[in-house]
């Protein structure tokens, strides 16, 4: 059992980080193994700007090796924030770069150093995740201070794959790193679909079945499908009990399995659109932000997509 949430500010910019943290705290009872968020359009100013989060070994010269690796693929480092969090011999570092090349090449360059592992890469998505509680997570990264257009979040109770930062949600697609997903449930035909995607050149970074969803949807969108069409395709192919929320730079999509075995509640107000595993997350936002939601539970096999107004 995990808790998932997606929020969108109807005017295109607002306290999305605070919305996510407040919602996730209301869902904390659904999982305490890890927590993560993706906040969109949080204010990158340079063209081709990327925010890279890495776990760097806390040893002399490690960050220098990472910097050299980034330069080797023509990445231009603009800022490094070291030691956002220190744990078990690793430093959680944030690196802002300007980069026009392949995200996969950048990922491989950093991983090849042997002293760092990539946690996330984003252009318009700012992704943070860690193995901790919502309250401690917010204390480390100050997520509640982030402004943005929309975002998704997750609290995890692990049932199958490992418990570490790399198995924490949100998951992203390396070819399309600003497509991210949070998921509650199980994908029972995971290995079959994974094999099919790998034959098409899709690379998986974990054995978490949730990662399959983002790759599947991103692949379908790369072939010309809209987010809504890709989600409808996905729920007809994915098997098992599931509900998920997926985000792109301009949209949030929500979907649940054909039997409706994992609940999702959506709420529409003049200021916020929200989807969450439980109504209590919506109630917190109503109370704290004076939102008046029109609520409904997602029907079996239903897909809903919200798009930013530009």
Where are the model-predicted features located?
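Conserved short alpha-helical segments that host acidic/polar catalytic motifs at enzyme active sites
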Residues: 1-310
